[in-house]
Amino acid sequence: MSEVVAETARRRTFAIISHPDAGKTTLTEKLLLFGGAIQMAGSVKSRKAVRHATSDWMTLEKERGISVTSSVMQFPYEGKIINLLDTPGHADFGEDTYRVLTAVDSALMVIDVAKGVEERTIKLMEVCRLRDTPIMTFINKLDREGKNPIELLDEVERVLGIQCAPVTWPIGMGKRLRGVVNLLTNEVHLYEPGRNFTRQDSTIFTSLEAPGLAERIGEQMLADLHEELELIQGASACFDPTEYLGGRQTPVFFGSGVNNFGVQPLLDFFVEHAPSPQQRDTTSRVVLPTEEKLTGFVFKIQANMDPQHRDRVAFMRVCSGRFTAGMKAFHVRSSKDLKLANALTFMASDRESVAEAFPGDVIGIHNHGRVSIGDTFTEGEVLSFTGIPSFAPELFRRACLGDPLKLKQLQKGLTQLSEEGATQFFRPLMSNDLILGAVGMLQFDVVAYRLKNEYGVDAAFEPVSITTARWVYCDNSKTLEEFREKNVTNLAVDASGELVYLAPTRVNLQLAQERAPEIHFFATREHAYAVGVD
């Protein structure tokens, strides 16, 4: 067996998705803790505490207590290599989350036991369904009162359209929480506040009939549990690996992330059943992970991960072959070889130089403006991975500068921050305005904050009369030039130099489309070609 085949089989690359405040970042911490990647989980609860969540590493995130950029973390567990991509839970950062989901092989969905399925979870599930991504579910905050577990499973099935297969089942909830029972092994894990719940620090009974269990949880609770399990095992599906890998069934676990409870069974099950790196579609062929030659694509760019070095790092998912430090790779878009020196692996903002990487791994490439989101790297073959789009923004603001002498820094800041993909930067053809587009208001706050802290620029963002944007293309260059002349007041270029129509109203956009039927208007732009024709 080749090294690439063996190492690919060891990889598990996944993302955690949830509605804001479902406890995703806390669970991320605990997975790292159980994986031995960190010694002490960050105090996510007290945001004023010195210890901040390991995966919320940017200054703004630490101050606000929300994840606004995706972190990448790698750790070994039970002979496997786990690549965990933490995603922003805040709704305004959906595009970043969408692109992260193109880089993983499976996902873990976190649901708040009291709130059930929430709006953001529904949207993220829709994205996962587009790619039939296998999903496991962790129902969190079991130490608080919440919905009836049977009703929760019914809600997940009804709202998200995916079959539930419970793997662990709660014994009580809130103040009555006594533990969980594993439906596959019949083991009972007791809940004892203050414990770490590692294998060495858990009270585990081998079955519901084990001596001493009734004394620990109470005769009545044990009798109720037997009754409930009879009902649930008769009414719910058994775990089916084929259905799970096809994205049609979700194994469900219950626990309390903040108390470390229920995390170990989840991680053990994940390592055993989650898929290793899968094949990937390109514009020309399917790439298998076990191919010997390196391929990979960039799904994220992060500016100023280290403010002292003013750096930009491109996050590349390795899709096939083996990456070695200092190797040259073919950058398909520019048709040039780039030396991938000083590539990095991550533990949130802690970074280490990487000697080698295999399919499923995410490496950081130092980027001096040559690499964009969606770019493909190979060992010479011309191909382009598909499905990594930019979306048309829904909100637009004009950047206003307090100090006109800082214009150059402002332009540089807006360009670099837009490369990360959470905002988009437009320059109208007929004015000197600097227009920023986003999908949520929070992004303008984030950009203003980062401009000040990372670029030394005080900028405000004022409303501008733009309702929506569309990328415009035409195969006939003469027709495109005529369209450009007639509509120059509504046209701009984005950070990549692509032509964009900025419509003041929906009616204006409709009229423009009717008057120029040979011009294609796109609501999303995918690297190498556009998708999503209006």
UniProtKB/Swiss-Prot annotation:
Entry-linked SUPFAM superfamilies: EF-G C-terminal domain-like, P-loop containing nucleoside triphosphate hydrolases, Translation proteins
Location of the protein in the cell: Cytoplasm
Residue ranges of domain tr-type G in the record: 9-278
Domain of life: Bacteria
Keyword Cytoplasm: yes
GO biological process, one term: regulation of translational termination
Keyword annotations: Cytoplasm, GTP-binding, Nucleotide-binding, Protein biosynthesis
Gene3D superfamilies given in the database record: P-loop containing nucleotide triphosphate hydrolases, Peptide chain release factor 3, domain III
Positions that bind GTP: 18-25, 86-90, 140-143
Keyword Nucleotide-binding: yes
GO cellular component annotations of the record: cytosol
An MF annotation (GO) of this entry: translation release factor activity, codon nonspecific
Pfam families in the cross-refs: EF-G_D2, GTP_EFTU, RF3_C
Functional note: Increases the formation of ribosomal termination complexes and stimulates activities of RF-1 and RF-2. It binds guanine nucleotides and has strong preference for UGA stop codons. It may interact directly with the ribosome. The stimulation of RF-1 and RF-2 is significantly reduced by GTP and GDP, but not by GMP.
HAMAP family: Rel_fac_3 (MF_00072)
Family: Belongs to the TRAFAC class translation factor GTPase superfamily. Classic translation factor GTPase family. PrfC subfamily.
The protein's name in its UniProt record: Peptide chain release factor 3
Organism whose genome encodes this protein: Xylella fastidiosa (strain 9a5c)
Source species taxonomy: Bacteria, Pseudomonadati, Pseudomonadota, Gammaproteobacteria, Lysobacterales
